[in-house]
Amino acid sequence: MDPSVKKDEIYYTILNIIQNYFIEYCTGKNRNFHVEDENTYIIVKNMCDIILRDNIVEFRKDIDRCSDIENEIPEIVYDTIHDKITWGRVISIIAFGAYVTKVFKEKGRDNVVDLMPDIITESLLSRCRSWLSDQNCWDGLKAYVYNNKKFYYVTRYFRVAAFIITSLAVINLFL
């Protein structure tokens, strides 16, 4: 635990989402109604689930390589975000933390399981507190997801429009 990390509103806002996700990932019990911001929780959960599905083998290798993983988390967080902080990287750190927590739970290391949400939260805040503050904490994630969805839909509509125009042009050729 890092005593230099300020335990303020940002800390507890981030911890609330991380802690509940870790519990849900380890137990399989839905935690949507235990969080302060259900919409953010669902976004984080869905993104983490995708990352875990796609990267579970790499996460397992990372855990096998480290002899003292719980003490190496701050360094792993630093290595992940030292050159650039993005929501994808922040969510990847949370997903990795959830996986590590589940491994510890399976090994019966409950003392570390209870500390993992705090370790991840502190590691994130010690490296990117100002960025998270500038993002207005989880509101920045919601805006990021909303803007990406808008871009996805606009791109999709352009493709559909292009397909329709092409189809009409082809039909016109045969008439």
From Swiss-Prot:
Biological process according to GO: regulation of apoptotic process; symbiont-mediated suppression of host apoptosis
Membrane topology: Single-pass membrane protein
Record bears the keyword Transmembrane helix: yes
Keyword field contains Transmembrane: yes
Compartments, as annotated in UniProt: Host membrane
Transmembrane stretches, start-end: 152-174
Any GO CC annotation of this UniProt entry: host cell membrane
Sorted UniProt keywords: Host membrane, Host-virus interaction, Inhibition of host apoptosis by viral BCL2-like protein, Membrane, Modulation of host cell apoptosis by virus, Transmembrane, Transmembrane helix
Known function: Plays a role in the inhibition of host apoptosis. Interacts with host proapoptotic factors BAK1 and BAX to supposedly prevent their activation.
Subunit structure comment from the entry: Interacts with host BAK1 and BAX as well as other BH3-containing proteins including BIM, BID or PUMA.
Protein name according to UniProt: Apoptosis regulator Bcl-2 homolog
